Amino acid sequence: ITPEEDRFLAAQLELARQFNLPVLVHTPHRDKIGGTKRTLAVIREVGIAENLVIIDHLNELTLPLVLDSDCWRGHSIYPNTKMSEQRMVALLQEYGSEKMVVNSAADWGISDPLKVPKTGQAMLAAGFSEAQVEQVLFHNPVDFFAQSGQLDKQLVSTPLPIDQRRQWQDNSALRGQEPVVK
């Protein structure tokens, strides 16, 4: 972490601490071990509650460092780079699901926003239960972000009714198909 990155990381963590808000920290692309160690040190120097921090873009080398903290453990699943579904499953098998969060992206590089459900499928194929998959892919991130007070866990856990008979401005996307109503 450069001195500038260090200063601005501390400033952003301080804002989160002052307002008691959760914060997501992206580990550096280079020197991931050193950067993760320094990130943890800055978190402690600022004094933000570790349970309000998720450290993201973890891998096999950096996850053990974060396990010694109360921070949440974020993993970005990408095609060809960073973390794959299979590597994520191996980490879950080794370290368990507590505070583990899986995400994906649709960003500037090669990415696949469907990597989260694909990771869920890989977890099921590896013998994880549906409840364990739901814990990692849904409940853990909801529990983390609900700490903000801006996310109602009950509301997001209640399935929305589906009625494809409803239209928007007299228009339907069904194109002649039978509507689903649940």
Where are these regions (language model features)?
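Divalent metal-coordination and catalytic microenvironments
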Residues: A16, R73, A105, V133, ...
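Active-site beta-loop-alpha junctions enriched in small/polar residues
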Residues: P28-R30, L58-L61, S76-N80, A105-G109
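Short acidic/histidine-rich active-site segments
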Residues: R30, S97-P113, V133
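Short acidic active-site motifs
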Residues: L61-T62, R87
